[in-house]
Amino acid sequence: MEGDLAALGGCASSASDDDGYGDEGGRIVCGRCDRPANACLCDALPDEPIRLERGCGVIVLQHPNERKRKLATVPVLTKALGSCDVLVGRKFRAGQEPVLDEAYRSAREGGADVFVLYPGPGARDLAREVAAVPRRPWTLVAIDGTWQQAKEMFKTNEDVLLPAGVPSARRVSLRPPEGGIRMPLRTEPERGCMTTMEAVASALGVLSDAPDLEPRILAPLAKLYGVQKGFSPSLKERAERGIDYKGSRRQRLVAGGGDGGGDDDE
């Protein structure tokens, strides 16, 4: 979609190649945030991607189908956070992903922690875990996909993510955000679910000593959410009305105007 480029806030006012814009499928696309020009996020992105403290990082295991979604939040996350590696696939094996292997090598040697962010029975509260262990390097592992895809990926890769004999690799969960869902780009299956970017930012807010880290990471997501409300009547309705979690999953999806894992488009 073409928009008024002069009104985009930190972006150029023409569509020439020199201005950082390209043409993708007939739409003008920003060369920095890779979003359509009239949905540009650049004025909410940090000048340089945020770097975490030495020895710390984020690994996102992304379902292949998630790359196709226009409102996937991980591409926005990687624009804001420099210390983030994205591995695409359904099944991951030891010895095939260097960044994953290095994180678990350090954990086996007892010099670092691995926190696998996946809620449910058996997950420990991240804030309590951080308070109980000495400060040392860590890696946060998150799964990116629809709720069903994430469930299947965790089950398939559980032996790799939580290997026997590595107590410093553990499954953790976040405390529900105050006020419930903050930016429901999708119709969540139950209260407390968040987008991948929200979950990672919230976890980093617990793991890091920097009090402004979480809001800095979430700024471009808030911009994306605000822009999309203007394009999507169903998203605007969900934001204004909230989501009723009392009905069946099907009733919630119909009421929310979503498919439980799809995206509203701009």
Q: What is each stretch, according to the model?
A:
Residues 133, 139, 147-266:
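C-terminal folded domains that constitute the principal catalytic or ligand-binding module
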Residues 37-40:
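Cys/His-rich microdomains that often coordinate metals
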Residues 82-165:
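S-adenosyl-L-methionine/SAH cofactor-binding core of RNA-modifying enzymes
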Residues 17-25:
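Short, flexible, mixed-charge glycine/proline-rich loop motifs
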Residues 57-67, 113-118:
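Short hydrophobic beta-strand segments
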Residues 30-33:
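Short cysteine-rich clusters marking metal-coordination/redox-active sites
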Residues 43, 69-80:
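Histidine-anchored nucleotide/phosphate-binding helix
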Residues 44-57:
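Short cysteine/histidine-rich metal-coordination sites, predominantly Zn2+-binding motifs
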